[in-house]
From Swiss-Prot:
GO terms for cellular component: plasma membrane. It comes from Zea mays (Maize). Belongs to the Casparian strip membrane proteins (CASP) family. Pfam families: CASP_dom (PF04535). Keywords: Cell membrane, Cell wall biogenesis/degradation, Glycoprotein, Membrane, Transmembrane, Transmembrane helix. Residues 1-20 are annotated as: Disordered. Regulates membrane-cell wall junctions and localized cell wall deposition. Required for establishment of the Casparian strip membrane domain (CSD) and the subsequent formation of Casparian strips, a cell wall modification of the root endodermis that determines an apoplastic barrier between the intraorganismal apoplasm and the extraorganismal apoplasm and prevents lateral diffusion. It is found in: Cell membrane. One of its GO terms (biological process) is cell wall organization. This is Casparian strip membrane protein 1. Its main location: membrane. The chain crosses the membrane at residues 28-48, 76-96, 116-136, 163-183. It comes from the Eukaryota. Residues 1-27, 97-115, 184-187 are cytoplasmic.
Length: 187
């Protein structure tokens, strides 16, 4: 059967240039997500670290003061966000190298491990701070802890706002891990 041809699916491989374009796009998105996470962690650490409020009590000589450093959980929050921000800043050059050399495998694997470690650091910091913020707003009747946000309202508003940047950075780190996994799987 000289003239017969086989009918069915044919496989066409994508041109090599489009694969590089996708890898470069993933690397650019990686860099953008790192910048967003840096902004979130830096803003959270600075805002929490500068949070305090003083209330006068009967006279101007007796005052009640609320600071982030009064609660070790909020101090851990500031330290964790600062460490993650420093790491993300130091990882920017490596992310830029991935844009230039999209085939870099071991450096991307290193970023996956370190990104996972930073996610493991920022998650308990943000979660513990969220628990303290909840207690500050609602209190706990069974433990006889009163809600302090009725008196220290600007303090509570500020520490509540700090959580947004930290939880946003958590989401960015998860997306960075997914992007790195996609980039490594394409090799």
């Amino acid at each position: 059967m000289k003239g017969s041809s086989e009918h069915g699916e044919t496989s066409k491989q994508a041109p090599l240039g489009s694969s590089r374009g996708v890898s470069k796009g993933v690397s650019v998105l990686d860099l953008i997500l790192r910048f967003i996470a840096i902004i979130g962690t830096l803003a959270s650490a600075i805002a929490m670290g500068t949070t305090n409020e003083t209330l006068p009590f009967f006279t101007q000589f007796i005052r009640f003061k609320a600071q982030y450093s009064d609660l070790p959980t909020l101090t851990f929050f500031v330290v964790a966000n600062s460490i993650v921000c420093a790491y993300l800043t130091l990882s920017l050059p490596l992310s830029i190298v991935h844009i230039i050399r999209s085939r870099a495998k071991y450096s991307r694997l290193l970023l996956v491990v370190l990104d996972a470690a930073m996610l493991a650091l920022v998650t308990p910091g943000a979660s513990a701070a969220a628990a303290i913020v909840y207690l500050a707003h609602k209190g706990n009747v069974r433990a006889n802890w009163l809600a302090i946000c009725q008196q220290f309202d600007s303090f509570c508003e500020r520490i509540s706002g700090c959580l947004i940047g930290s939880f946003g950075a958590m989401v960015m780190l998860v997306l960075l891990l997914l992007l790195s996994a996609i980039a490594l799987a394409r090799r």
